């Protein structure tokens, strides 16, 4: 049956728990409703990526991990470290909520969307990815979906790894997790990654001067976590991480002015939590602080020159989550408080501003016979636009053993970001962007194939756009998104297959024109097998036709970008029980394509890596 585990035993740890692990026969997830539950009881489409998956794929960036997942469309202005956007099910990049250990990613505060090209892949131990509306649980941004990156390791030991590759890529990483007595464990990590890169922009997008240089990326990361069990029921943790990145990119050149083409990002985050894990009642309190400084400057003049820009953001968060088991399900409730502050002189916001938000929410999940019911409601009180409410509901019916029909409806919203509100062209009277979504799905297990097929519609109103005439942001846009998503995974002998298909018709509801940079169709296929102790993997991705703007001349022209098929080949060999060597060829057939018009992709790339564990 689909219901492989009782909800009474499933809800054993509170949401955002760093101890969550994959278990057999059903993976446990914590992101869907802020409490741990079997993935089969989550009615929204959910995907889990483990560190073992990331190592098997030999991914060198978070974007390379996410591009493999259903409903995800990644665009990037070139290679490693270059500006990137995540589109989920055709929604805007700002309509994706990115969490780090359950806490909102700070870097999205000023610009409004998460650029995961800057987040170190070394920190990622697990990814939980939920499609569809989730504002009734998490508040702003969760229109297209939620990506929760979990950083804490789930196994003890020490690992030393090194890798090299095309474009002078090199990576060195050391991590360890040690038990201090029976009740305490500590985790430490250090990582260094660097690539010389390549020239990402074709002449024409950079103004009157070509910039035939390598656009490289450098990242240095430190991480530490301390976890302690006070009793069988009470536990706590403290963790922190920081990274220092430098990115070289191609910028638009204006004669006589400095060429701002270097980005320097400093980011640090600290959080602490206390958990109570009783038999029927669970509770967790988390406090978090994060601080980022994002400089863009001309390296000839330095990042403190008047030509440089700085985006500086501080974020303070307090979360109190609770869960109680009732009947064949549970009820959850909690409070979120968040303050985002910009420093005076921030590029988007000249003066210093604070934005505060307090949200209260209630969630529920109950099984009644062959039916599963899920609901959530939330009210947010924002210091800028006042109170806003969202809700969602879902129902699942297992009409035949192993087969289920799911129907859901939800509302969600996106709050204006600080740049849109208070920047040089800001409008403090902006309202939130609003969404209404419907979805119907069938899923089941047929002849060893786990499959799901769903259709959805998303109507987004009050979209925030920029007016070239008034030089202000305003609420006027509307979007209409219709889509079909199909996923399946199965084994044939020694071969493991994972496949997905996405059809997305994302349009401006006023002009009936396609939304930019979204592929209308995508096919993704992962094939894994073992032969003579070698672990092999083939990744295939088809990106369909999409549209973009050519910004090299005015007026801007809409351009059509053709589809492309991409193949990756990866292999790993365990030399000993401690030493593993890995190799990968990305873009095996050296396809020439772009995800953002005018910005070149890397072509064929090679990587070779080794890891030693003890």
Curated annotation (Swiss-Prot):
A motif (TonB C-terminal box) lies at residues 597-614. It comes from the Bacteria. A motif (TonB box) lies at residues 26-33. Ca(2+) 1 binds at residues 199, 211, 213, 215, 250. Pfam families: Plug (PF07715), TonB_dep_Rec_b-barrel (PF00593). It is found in: Cell outer membrane. InterPro entries: B12_transptr_BtuB, Plug_dom, Plug_dom_sf, TonB-dep_rcpt-like, TonB-dep_rcpt_b-brl, TonB_box_CS, TonB_rcpt_b-brl_sf. Residues 38-152 form the TBDR plug domain. Cyanocob(III)alamin binds at residues 83, 85, 92, 110-111, 251, 309, 517, 551. The chain crosses the membrane at residues 158-165, 169-178, 184-195, 217-227, 232-248, 263-277, 279-296, 309-325, 328-337, 353-369, 371-381, 385-400, 403-417, 434-443, 449-458, 473-490, 494-509, 517-529, 535-550, 558-572, 585-596, 602-614. Keywords: Calcium, Cell outer membrane, Ion transport, Membrane, Metal-binding, Porin, Signal, TonB box, Transmembrane, Transmembrane beta strand, Transport. Residues 1-20 form the signal peptide. It is a multi-pass membrane protein. GO terms for biological process: monoatomic ion transport. Ca(2+) 2 binds at residues 213, 215, 249-250, 261. One of its GO terms (cellular component) is cell outer membrane. Residues 155-614 form the TBDR beta-barrel domain. GO terms for molecular function: ABC-type vitamin B12 transporter activity; metal ion binding; porin activity. Belongs to the TonB-dependent receptor family. BtuB (TC 1.B.14.3.1) subfamily. HAMAP family: BtuB. This is Vitamin B12 transporter BtuB. It comes from Escherichia coli O6:H1 (strain CFT073 / ATCC 700928 / UPEC). The lineage of its organism: Bacteria, Pseudomonadati, Pseudomonadota, Gammaproteobacteria, Enterobacterales. The gene is btuB.
